[in-house]
A protein has these predicted regions:
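N-terminal targeting signals for export/organelle localization
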Residues: 1-51, 223, 228-229
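Short loop/turn microsegments at loop-to-beta-strand junctions
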Residues: 51-52, 74, 172-174
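Hydrophobic beta-strand positions
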Residues: 55-56, 177
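Short active-site neighborhood of thiol/selenol oxidoreductases, capturing the structured segment around
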Residues: 64-94, 109-110
Length: 230
């Protein structure tokens, strides 16, 4: 309990800082992907890009859809269990991120295999158990390979077979943040360009990822607070 308090405390202090400030000082993350302008009551609204619906299977063979992840902030990545190169390091760093927010129920990790033929629900369950990854905080998914690769493309990450690569697959070392409405969120770089994703093998980008999760948590809690006051 003491360890959890120490790990979560920086995020809680950030929330306290944000709520102690005027609304005008609140800074949040940008939306990734093309916006759509739609007519509404004689005016126009901006609809932010939402990741496509998906239907995959978790380690208990239960169906998980995108809409079931609503009201959750999650970091999405791609991997495969027999990956001999980058995946062990990727998931080590992602696990450290997860530990930082262990006390916040609305935050999770979601990792989707790019090798569903080998990575069945039971295989992923064994993989998760062997590495002691918390099933309450980290969801591993498998499913139709074509659907997985289409989702990767739709969220601007790479995932495909490559027989010349070690393990037979190539995928991004980057992860993305998905907010509670299915939007990809990210900071801007020093030149004002939206970063989009975070290379979890890069220490600087890992720190950015952690900081940006705190920002989204603050925004989510602020919005819930404002809705209660309406």
């Amino acid at each position: 309990a003491v360890l959890i308090s120490v790990l979560v405390l920086p995020a809680l202090l950030y929330l306290f800082f944000v709520y102690g400030q005027s609304e005008v000082f609140f800074q949040t993350l940008d939306y990734v992907g093309p916006d759509e302008v739609v007519a509404n009551d004689g005016g126009f609204d901006t609809v932010h890009y939402t990741i496509p619906d998906f239907e995959f299977y978790n380690t208990d063979s239960a169906v998980v859809t995108r809409t079931e992840m609503d009201s959750t902030i999650y970091v999405l990545s791609f991997f495969f269990a027999t990956c001999p190169t980058i995946c062990p390091a990727m998931n080590f760093h992602l696990n450290e991120i997860q530990k930082r927010f262990k006390g916040y129920d609305q935050f999770k990790l979601v990792s989707i295999t790019v090798d569903p033929e080998k990575d069945s629900p039971s295989a992923l369950k064994a993989y998760q158990k062997e590495r002691n990854y918390d099933p309450a905080k980290w969801t591993f998914l498998t499913g139709d390979q074509a659907a997985i690769y289409e989702l990767a493309k739709a969220v601007y990450l790479n995932a495909f077979e490559d027989q010349t690569a070690e393990g037979g697959f190539l995928h991004s070392t980057s992860a993305i943040i998905i907010d509670w409405d299915g939007h990809i969120r990210s900071r801007k770089d020093d030149l004002g360009n939206i970063v989009g994703s975070y290379d979890v093998l890069d220490v600087t980008q890992l720190n950015d990822l952690e900081d940006d999760i705190k920002v989204l948590i603050a925004e989510y809690e602020r919005d819930k607070h404002n809705q209660r006051d309406e």
